[in-house]
């Protein structure tokens, strides 16, 4: 995987917003909270400045404005760091988007521990638990550029609230864009193996693939399963793994409490 091209999924997010708008998604609007350079919505702003709204450091207000615009037929993508949009904006997401089941997409970048030098205050390891608790909320956690692009398109096409989780760091692009097909609610087997099953999501998927390579050198065959949808989760692929292997390891940048 060392030779693979690396792209941060937050960059994939910004690029795909532009592609959607170019292809006729005239109802797509993008919101940010003074972090457009980091969330990469600046890519969209440069080409469609009249459809990009910077709400300043006011995540709760941003969520409320986006909810209101969705009632007028727009499809808002709300963007900020996971800690800020899911943490600071939780009440508004719950009451203004989740409760009325509005068609708003929440794009959370810089999720998990891999935020690194941004520090502990920015390392969000609670967002998936918060978003899973909201009835009707779809949660997507893509692993590479190809999957992230497909997830953004799927989120736009889906009529309802979606939480998209993106990484700060660049990750290897291991999917083939010519053959990969994304479907909400479906996991994906990446490697064969009959000793251990590893179920990973997001940034941890390429780490699981690297671990599988190292384990193979020691005679251990790992089946790596990519779980790009956290909710609704692919129960079938999990139950199959439980029936076929005695050991299942889950890998995620998130608290398991």
Task: Identify the residue ranges that each predicted region occupies.
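Thiamine diphosphate
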Residues: 1-165, 167-257
């Amino acid at each position: 995987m060392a030779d693979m091209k690396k792209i941060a999924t937050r960059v994939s997010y910004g690029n795909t917003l532009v592609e959607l708008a170019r292809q006729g998604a005239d109802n797509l609007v993008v919101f940010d909270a003074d972090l457009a350079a980091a969330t990469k919505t600046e890519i969209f702003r440069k080409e469609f400045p009249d459809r990009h709204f910077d709400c300043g450091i006011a995540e709760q207000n941003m969520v409320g404005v986006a909810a209101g615009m969705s009632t007028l037929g727009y499809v808002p993508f709300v963007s900020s760091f996971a800690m800020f949009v899911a943490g600071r904006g939780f009440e508004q997401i719950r009451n203004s988007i989740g409760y009325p089941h509005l068609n708003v997409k929440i794009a959370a970048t810089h999720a998990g521990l891999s935020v690194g030098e941004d520090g502990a205050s920015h390392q969000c390891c609670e967002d998936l638990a918060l978003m899973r608790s909201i009835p009707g909320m779809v949660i997507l956690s893509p692993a590479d550029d190809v999957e992230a692009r497909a997830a953004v398109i799927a989120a736009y096409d889906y009529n309802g609230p979606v939480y998209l989780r993106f990484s700060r760091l660049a990750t290897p692009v291991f999917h083939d864009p010519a053959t990969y097909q994304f479907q909400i609610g479906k996991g994906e087997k990446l490697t064969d193996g009959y000793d251990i099953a590893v179920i990973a999501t997001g940034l941890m998927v390429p780490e699981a693939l690297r671990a599988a390579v190292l384990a193979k050198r020691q005679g251990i065959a790992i089946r790596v399963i990519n779980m790009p949808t956290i909710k609704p989760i692919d129960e079938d692929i999990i139950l199959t793994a439980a029936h076929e292997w005695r050991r299942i390891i889950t890998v995620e940048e998130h608290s398991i409490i």
